[in-house]
């Protein structure tokens, strides 16, 4: 990139700025200064107004921007007005002035957020050309003064307000710079990577690691990386300007001007690092120099704006606010789906840490929210900033999040204190290893030894098993073997990444050390989760488990979070008398008031329910949990009152005593085998089929299509003259009858079996209706349905069907799974086959007949949502009769309460 050339001659903008400064001298008005000279770029449209008015002489309180044009640009020019509007919004201003030497106009933002014309100056309407500007200077200068004084009047009466330098620097300008340059940079990176295979491959490796963080925002690798490049530059420029008062080496940031290139900029910042640390903030993102010239001008503009506005003169508290808001903007722009909200991080730290004087760590630090919460809580209790920082450790696998993390934990009052921050995969962190950090005073190296930690607090990465990076597969294989050797429990290859990390962290904790983690809720309702839970018991005392009963913790993610509080113990067989507290938080953690937050923390730390409107708890011993889970009830149900299960356990049996589970078809190519409409296939090869439960409204269901099931070879079909069927097969094969699609799961490929037929079905992802539907005839079903068949030994199918749909049957379905981000229930075929039902053998013939009769009143109507269903008089009579038939009608209200409570928790995340 070539050097950017600046104007040497004094532009009219500089003349106007100078004249305004002179006229303000000694006036005693609220407008104290004017500026803007340093950001008058000539190569492109600037990010900033040509003239800035300030409410203070230090130029930290921006009042208004002016956009200047020569007379050949009309004052009504739409592009001019739009440009001025954009700049005002970026600076957080509610007014602007446009001036073309012929006319002047003041615009003020109305209550609806639109800028509307407030005043016009036309005293120089005779100025028509650039030459006239020079000729009639003496006539337009008084108009400039008149505009300034009018603006001052609007300032005095409150119509015009000053913008906050905090929001301007950390939000408005950063967002503006990113939005107007993202696609330019993306295109440039794409062009350059087409010339450089190493660059292309590096970008793809980066995208594989980070793409999930951009799923809600960017689905294009180049746009996502462009955004990261721009944030890398804005974060570094802002941070250097913010700390230069305290670290003189950072004054070198002023050298990034219009005569420099991006490579020069990196070298200037590297010089700052050599003298004063903050390496994690100042580290350049790879390929950050691959930006177009126009983008570099914007970055220089941003830097010069910070210099001209004397950011270093802002008081410490405001600077701290700028740093914090910069972190928020960076997180928002990246839209990291699982970034930890600060209130959640603060609560997690306080319910986990036992001794604030000991070393604490977040080894999946991400953007540093948890580490910041640790430092803040330490500082409040031990009253020594140096010790708070010295005993807090943070690391992450990737360097980029640590740039934001370093800014997040930076304390303007404690800039000279080294930060224990390093880049390492969590599986590679070892106690006793040496790391090098920088002394922020002189840039010298400091060698630190990783200690055993008193506490580790982390939001573990929500990475599904099939998305784990290749470089971590080896670690996972090693830990799978270690866990099996220690516990006898085998983790399958479909176990998610977070399931392994607590076992690694065990090594890094001191004796009785505490671990507080946020993980996905999937472990609460799956076989894999059951293995995880049981293996944890060998390594840790599980003290508390928390989930939300009031909105989700992560607003921009579909993942539902849980908190686990663990205490390290000797690896040994679990003590089944140990008790676990299962907590429901009843306040929105992201908006919880301070008093309620304190109540929540007190409750969990003391294992005591203090205010049920804030949090409720259910407590179980490990042996209680083992007993409950044998009835097909998941861990997810333990947050609710299910103590009544002890009263009913002798009256229930596994549903597999009455039903056989049927495997739904997984064809690999549905269009070959699922027939909906006319076809040339012979009728004898077509069987009734149900693909989905979406349209099932009642307790009975009918097939909604046909399935192609052929048990004959091609030769047999030819011999039998089955030309229509052969025609269908040829539609999906070559001349040799070999399949065009390689994903088909049958052998021979066209022979889907017809023997797997179901009598009953239910959905894998039910929502507000919980029921099992009976099919009018035995049908083939798709894999997405949970399908069952009556066993030949069943004497009374009507009774079994009724019992499956009783209040206990609905509870059994709800209690078997866990909630997903969309609010639906997630249950699996393997999990479902473990649920129990009321044992029909224990019901008398008389009661059975009455139950069937009562069920017939609801069987033929539409299934209602649970709340409505339970309010229905016929339903109540049926459910109470079922419970009365086993001598436990008194449990009706308990079961109803449990069912409604579980549904509320599942739906509150929407």
Annotate each PLM feature:
Residues 222-249, 458-459, 499, 507, ...:
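P-loop NTPase catalytic cores that bind/hydrolyze ATP
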Residues 806, 846-910:
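Amphipathic alpha-helical coiled-coil/heptad-repeat segments
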């Amino acid at each position: 990139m070539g050097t950017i050339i600046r104007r040497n001659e004094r532009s009219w903008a500089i003349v106007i700025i100078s004249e305004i400064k002179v006229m303000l001298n000694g006036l005693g008005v609220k407008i104290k200064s004017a500026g803007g000279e340093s950001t008058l770029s000539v190569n492109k449209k600037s990010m900033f107004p040509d003239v800035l008015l300030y409410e203070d002489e230090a130029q930290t309180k921006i009042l208004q921007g002016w956009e200047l044009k020569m007379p050949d640009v009309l004052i009504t020019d739409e592009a001019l007005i739009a440009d001025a509007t954009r700049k005002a919004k970026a600076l957080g201003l509610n007014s602007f002035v446009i001036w073309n030497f012929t006319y002047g106009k003041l615009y003020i933002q109305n209550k609806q957020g639109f800028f509307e014309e407030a005043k016009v100056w036309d005293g120089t309407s005779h100025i028509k050309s650039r030459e006239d500007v020079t000729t009639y200077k003496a006539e337009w200068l008084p108009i400039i003064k008149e505009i300034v004084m009018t603006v001052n009047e609007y300032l005095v009466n409150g119509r015009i307000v000053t913008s906050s330098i905090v929001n301007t620097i950390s939000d408005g300008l950063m967002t503006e710079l990113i939005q107007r340059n993202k696609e330019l940079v993306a295109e440039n990176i794409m062009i350059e990577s087409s010339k450089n295979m190493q660059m292309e491959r590096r970008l793809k490796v980066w995208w594989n690691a980070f793409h999930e963080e951009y799923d809600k925002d960017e689905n294009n690798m180049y746009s996502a990386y462009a955004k990261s490049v721009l944030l890398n530059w804005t974060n570094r420029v802002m941070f250097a300007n913010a700390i230069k008062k305290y670290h003189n080496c950072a004054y070198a940031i002023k050298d990034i001007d219009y005569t420099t290139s991006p490579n020069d900029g990196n070298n200037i910042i590297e010089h700052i690092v050599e003298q004063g640390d903050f390496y994690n903030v100042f580290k350049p993102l790879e390929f950050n120099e691959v930006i177009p010239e126009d983008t570099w001008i914007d970055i220089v503009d941003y830097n010069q704006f910070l210099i001209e506005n004397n950011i270093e003169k802002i008081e410490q508290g405001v600077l701290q606010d700028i740093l914090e808001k910069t972190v928020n903007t960076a997180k928002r722009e990246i839209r990291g789906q699982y970034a930890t909200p600060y209130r959640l991080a603060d609560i997690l730290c306080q319910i986990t840490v036992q001794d604030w004087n000991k070393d604490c760590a977040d080894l999946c630090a991400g953007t540093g929210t948890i580490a910041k919460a640790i430092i803040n809580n330490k500082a409040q209790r031990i009253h020594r900033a140096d010790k708070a920082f010295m005993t807090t450790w943070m690391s992450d696998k990737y360097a980029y999040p640590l740039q934001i993390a370093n800014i997040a934990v930076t304390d303007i009052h404690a800039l000279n204190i080294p930060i224990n921050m390093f880049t390492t995969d969590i599986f590679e962190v070892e106690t006793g290893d040496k790391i090098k950090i920088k002394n922020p005073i002189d840039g010298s190296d400091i060698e630190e030894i990783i200690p055993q930690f008193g506490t580790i607090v982390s939001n573990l990465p929500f990475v599904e098993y099939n998305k784990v990076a290749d470089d971590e597969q080896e670690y996972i294989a090693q830990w799978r073997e270690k866990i099996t050797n220690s516990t006898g429990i085998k983790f399958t290859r479909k176990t998610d990444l977070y399931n392994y990390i607590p076992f690694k962290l065990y090594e890094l904790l001191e004796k009785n050390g505490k671990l507080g983690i946020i993980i996905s809720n999937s472990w609460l309702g799956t076989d894999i989760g059951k293995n995880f839970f049981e293996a944890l018991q060998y390594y840790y005392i599980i003290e508390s488990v928390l989930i939300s009963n009031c909105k989700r913790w992560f607003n921009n993610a579909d993942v539902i979070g849980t908190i686990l509080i663990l205490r390290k113990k000797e690896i040994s067989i679990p003590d089944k008398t140990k008790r676990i507290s299962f907590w429901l938080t009843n306040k929105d953690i992201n908006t919880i008031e301070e008093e309620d937050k304190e109540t929540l923390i007190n409750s969990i730390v003391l294992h005591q329910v203090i205010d049920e409107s804030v949090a409720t708890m259910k407590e179980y011993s490990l042996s209680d949990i083992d007993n409950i889970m044998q009835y097909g009830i998941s861990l997810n149900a333990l947050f609710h009152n299910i103590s009544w299960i002890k009263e009913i356990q002798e009256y229930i049996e596994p549903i597999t005593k009455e039903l056989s589970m049927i495997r739904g078809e997984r064809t690999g190519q549905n269009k070959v085998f699922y027939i909906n409409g006319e076809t040339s296939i012979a009728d004898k090869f077509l069987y009734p089929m149900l693909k989905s439960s979406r349209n099932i409204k009642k307790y009975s269901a009918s097939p909604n299509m046909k399935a192609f099931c052929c048990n004959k070879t091609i030769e047999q079909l030819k011999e039998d003259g089955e030309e229509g069927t052969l025609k269908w097969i040829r539609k999906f094969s070559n001349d040799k009858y070999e399949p065009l699609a390689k994903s088909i799961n049958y052998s021979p490929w066209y022979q889907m079996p017809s023997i797997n037929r179901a009598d009953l079905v239910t959905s894998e992802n039910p929502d507000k209706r919980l029921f099992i539907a009976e099919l009018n005839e035995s049908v083939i079903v798709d894999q997405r349905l949970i399908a069952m068949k009556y066993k030949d030994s069943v004497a009374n199918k009507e009774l079994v069907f009724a019992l499956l749909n009783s209040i206990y049957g609905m509870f059994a379905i709800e209690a078997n799974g866990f909630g997903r981000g969309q609010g639906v229930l997630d249950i699996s075929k393997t999990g479902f086959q473990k649920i129990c039902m009321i044992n029909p053998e224990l019901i008398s013939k008389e009661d059975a007949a009455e139950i069937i009769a009562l069920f017939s009143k609801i069987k033929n109507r539409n299934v209602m949502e649970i709340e409505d269903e339970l309010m229905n008089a016929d339903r109540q009579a049926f459910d109470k009769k079922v419970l009365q038939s086993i001598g436990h009608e008194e449990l009706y209200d308990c079961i109803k309460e449990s069912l409604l409570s579980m549904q509320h928790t599942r739906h509150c995340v929407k």
